[in-house]
């Protein structure tokens, strides 16, 4: 079956998702909740794309391709929508290191370690440097969160 993503035509397997086809062909669509060993969860909504003929944006991780489908995966409108979604997610999680302008050359270990040993900064996190959340924040160029922080430690 043929699928077009951002003007490029691809062959796709039946039951493949938009995200599967994009990744197989080197097109980056940010996502946080998708995992190859799990069924599509569509919880984070960061992988939203537009499908010609459908109203609104749909999650690429949970939308199966159809023959002749035309998908827009990259656009300023989608990036704005993804930024808003990610800012809402970050408003409920510790995010200071993720959006700090000094995050790539932090002069100190800017972390908060509570009595229980909880690390809320990226510097001491065992996934620092290979975290999908860091990649998505960088890709969407998020440098502030306009929603109030609601997380509890």
Listing of model-derived features with the role each one plays in the protein:
Residues 45, 54-153:
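Fe-S ferredoxin-like electron-transfer domains
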């Amino acid at each position: 079956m043929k699928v077009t993503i951002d003007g490029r035509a691809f062959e796709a397997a039946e039951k493949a998702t938009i995200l599967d086809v994009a990744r197989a062909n080197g097109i980056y669509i940010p996502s946080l909740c998708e995992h190859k060993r799990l069924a599509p969860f569509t919880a984070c909504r960061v992988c939203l794309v537009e499908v010609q003929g459908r109203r609104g944006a749909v999650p690429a991780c949970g939308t199966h391709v159809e023959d002749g489908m035309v998908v827009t995966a990259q656009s300023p409108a989608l990036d704005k929508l993804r930024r808003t979604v990610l800012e809402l997610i970050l408003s409920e999680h510790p995010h200071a290191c993720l959006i700090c302008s000094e995050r790539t050359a932090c002069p100190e270990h800017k972390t908060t370690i509570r009595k229980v040993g909880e690390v809320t900064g990226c510097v001491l996190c065992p996934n620092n440097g290979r975290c999908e959340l860091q990649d998505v924040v960088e890709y969407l160029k998020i440098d502030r969160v306009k929603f109030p922080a609601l997380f509890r430690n």
